[in-house]
Amino acid sequence: MAAPIDVKPKHGFSLVTSSAYHLKILSDLLKSNIKEQNARVNNKGIFIRGADEKENTLIDVELYASALNMEPPSSETKIGIVFSHLHEIMRRIKRKDSLHISRDEGSDQLNFNIMNAEKDRDKDAFIRLKDIQDDPWDVPVYPEQVICTIPASEFQRMTKENAKQKYMTIRIQKRGVKFIAGTPQQPQLSGMEDRYGKYKDGEDDLYCRVFETKQLTKLAKVNGLATNNFLKLYWLDDEHPIKLESAIDLIGRLCIYISPVVVAQVPTAQ
């Protein structure tokens, strides 16, 4: 077992961004899927990788130092964040607010200063950082070719409309994807389905698996991460998760890796 992270030799850093509202949405998304995790902070930016309790959803965040007006730490440091604590602060942010985040040299807390555009509202807060043991999640390299893009607003609508269904089936072809309410063995009578890209009935599927609908519903917040946001869908092979990639305004990117639940043997052909 790896030794616990020593948070005593701490390295200071700070950043200022006008994309505070998008970071608020990101904090909500992280809280809904991950309990706690270390963030790596270095001269390239801030990196967070963590999974839900069942490890069926893995989220990978990259925030760019160059887009955050960041003064990086003198060397790479790790900060242990409880995401429910982070969201308690971030939920106070309103549209057009700016955000200053800092950590003083030798401190075990992360400081937040929320400012509005008129500079007549200024809120200070902090969270305590926590000792968290790293989980070694690795992600495979996916082909650069995108299967298709999905409007984030449509993804949010679809997950909300199907929230009462326990399962959803995802079928992938070379240039398209279809989401179906229910499982192949028990499709819902409503016949709800959504297609993106150039999915065609009659063509063989590369992939067909069953997912818990709540797993997808907890990702609906991706719609708020950027203006006119789109999700890029990538597929590697039958044994690896589906990859969804989203911009985080102009300051970073989010990759989500979702794995299916096992309900029954599912045919891979239409």
Question: Could you tell me what each predicted segment is?
Answer:
Residues 1-31, 36-164, 169-270:
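DNA polymerase sliding clamps and clamp-related checkpoint/processivity subunits
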